[in-house]
Amino acid sequence: LASASQFSKVGKIINADPERKFVVPSAPGKRNDKDTKVTDMLYACYALAKEEKSFSSALKKIKERYESIINGLHMKLSLDEEFKTIEKNFAEKAGEDYAASRGEYLNGIIMANYLGYEFVDPADAIRFDEDGNFMPEETDKLLKKRLKGVERAVVPGFYGAKADGTIKTFSRGGSDITGSIVAKAVQADVYENWTDVSGFKIADPRIIKNPEGIDIITYS
């Protein structure tokens, strides 16, 4: 979901099957080999804020990434208020987890508006304890309650929150975890995980040319 064209492609995939009711997006990744993932841009931006250095220019570049997606999709959507809040929270040292999570949060807002789905902030339903450990049972209960009666929703991946509202993230790539959590909560028949590579490979296709696929894999 790094560009407007990718959003359009994902939108077509989702709309191709009316049973695809709950969508869990990640933050914008690289548009090309020389590009930077938005999550890394957010980490770098917050590092400046943490060191009491000016971070307005770095934050502006992040905002421009999202605006290029919105403009490319010809949407009437403004993220001005969201970025004002982010700027304020960065200045108040809201934490690295908060900073990193904004990538998914903002992409979720765009995706929800693009699809016409309800936006559900995982900070309200995916719960971590005071030590930062994921609480599966509490999360399942909260998510079931939050999504009850919701026909279609976008739930950003990668993060949740402690009971006091402090944002906590999973490890990098945690949107896949969020997807499985949401699938369980809504008792989905199928959980589909779409990435830029089809299936499981025995090696990284960016390093090894045409690696063989793994047709069946066990898990525990």
Range-by-range predicted roles:
Residues 1-220:
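Nucleotide/pyrophosphate-binding catalytic subdomain
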